[in-house]
């Protein structure tokens, strides 16, 4: 099959798990003999065509009033204008139409669409492509993509959500199959009124299984945090946990965002070792317990699965798709249930049957079944 995958970012650009998941899927499809073109955006003003691991990649100019992932603070009016343009980005829609005419895909599979817009669905359907959409964030429901604001979850029934999502619901009628990366995110979109007459599935992200690593002595547990060092990810709670356990070593890998100056100071005051960016495999060798006090409704939780596959214990919160993961995988404990870090059990071995639904080949085959219809 000839497949176009669409995602806001693609290799080598990365801010979260979505980019990893889309890259794994793209390269797995190539290995199975399919033709794959990935369409994404970048911060430059010219289109760039390249190839990586057999995947053709097209980076389109961002085509808005500013680069949406810039760390520069913007005034409220600029933000509103950016999001209004992003409801239907005419420039990107035209570029995408040209790509469809050139590539002639059988399948258009969209993922994160912030900065690209849902206009691509309409263009794909115009040329009789089968359209699949996978939600990896909450962009369709609200432009902040997290459904988390001022320290609490946003209601999908709020006026703001209804207004921002209306045009996307209309464009969503061009989607043939809808996929959520957890039952939680799928059900949340259904609750918000999306994809009423569309086929719907849950397909968890593929996660490559790592070798189980030995732990250090039980009285010398090293606790780690990996991901974006932000409030919604619970990094402040990680720092406070460090303050309460000064005899333990606390290590954090990841980058701060533009609003995290106070968090960085909190980390330094809490004696948290900051590594900056660190590859997941390298980080897993430095720690014994992964602490992820996530506050927003994380749709999946790739780091949780990566940590479990690396033989770690995960301490986290009952949020979003992570609650589902705790019913599938062992070694996941909730912070509200833990009184003493030293009482946390050693990890138990993972059964192959528990890994299956995250297996790269298994996940790719699930998508291929959907592609074929």
Swiss-Prot record:
PANTHER family assigned: SULFOQUINOVOSYL TRANSFERASE SQD2 (PTHR45947:SF3)
Record's protein name: Uncharacterized 42.6 kDa protein in cps region
Highest taxon above the source species: Bacteria
InterPro entries xrefs: Glyco_trans_1, Glyco_trans_4-like_N, Glycosyltransferase_grp1
GO molecular function: glycosyltransferase activity
Coiled coil: none
Originating organism: Klebsiella pneumoniae
CDD domains reported in the protein's UniProt record: GT4_ExpE7-like
Pfam families with a match to the protein in the record: Glyco_transf_4, Glycos_transf_1
